From Swiss-Prot:
Keywords: Amino-acid biosynthesis, ATP-binding, Cytoplasm, Kinase, Nucleotide-binding, Threonine biosynthesis, Transferase. It catalyses: L-homoserine + ATP = O-phospho-L-homoserine + ADP + H(+). It holds the Pfam family GHMP_kinases_C. Its EC number is 2.7.1.39. InterPro entries: GHMP_kinase_C_dom, GHMP_kinase_C_sf, GHMP_kinase_N_dom, GHMP_knse_ATP-bd_CS, Homoserine_kinase, Ribosomal_Su5_D2-typ_SF, Ribsml_uS5_D2-typ_fold_subgr. This is Homoserine kinase. ATP binds at P84, F85, S86, R87, G88, L89, G90, S91, S92, S93, A94. The lineage of its organism: Bacteria, Pseudomonadati, Campylobacterota, Epsilonproteobacteria, Campylobacterales. The gene is thrB. One of its GO terms (biological process) is threonine biosynthetic process. Belongs to the GHMP kinase family. Homoserine kinase subfamily. It comes from Campylobacter concisus (strain 13826). The keyword Amino-acid biosynthesis applies. It is found in: Cytoplasm. It is an enzyme of class 2 (transferase).
Amino acid sequence: MNILIPATSANLGPGFDALGLSLKLFNSVKIEPSKFSSVSINGEGSDSTNLKRNNIFLSIFNEIFLELTGKNENFRIVFENNIPFSRGLGSSSAVIVGAIASAYEMAGFKASKSVVLNKAIIYETHPDNISPAVHGGFISAVVKNGNVYANKINLSDDIKAVVVIPNKPMSTASSRQILPKNYTMKECVNNLSHAAFLTSCFYEKRYDLLRVASEDMMHEERRMSALKELFEVRKVAYENGALMSTLSGSGSSFLNIAYKDDAKNLQDALKSKFGDFRVEIFSFDNDGYEITQS
């Protein structure tokens, strides 16, 4: 079997730990029964012997396969990793979702996406990345009593993601340590109102209002202070056609949304200014992970 798992961008400004969306940038995993277990990694992480020895995908896959079948079996697993590590593009969620969905498939169970999502929350407690990795689209999600409740809005082909990917990683754990334990009433109300407004803008396709809707007062600027160039990324993006410019997850990548006809000009402007960073254009994914038989 083969599985494709999309990259994701979470928070989207004010939707801290609640909002996310899916990009057409995929990791793929091919799994087949084998006489002996083997692992091959291509792309991101291919030069890491530690990743092969301490592979989170394998750990989760084997745990769930054993839970479902009561036995261990040998598999040949080939990873094609395209999602950058520790750049705020959901590489960890792709691993978790991919491992769970693959384990159910190889064990002979046709798990619904709801089952996969609720299993994934055990390993990743924030639903804003795992939900779009499962369902695709723009997602608003909450967790209640261990269950994930997620609503999806399909994203239009009229808009594109222009993603700035710095060469400096930022781990979610260290990025969270920057944040305060308490927030003011003003900060909380700002993010509640803007997250609600942002969701309605995507639903109504009012992309012209995304810049207003995506204002955050809780986490972005605090996190961006670890990589000062990100403030300039946002400035250049808005000067060159971006509808919305937000930190992707905990960073260090920056998500810029533009009309498809403006995306190339925006990419060129960002590349010209930030030559050391990758700047890529992606379509939005509305499907989430997909399994096919090889």
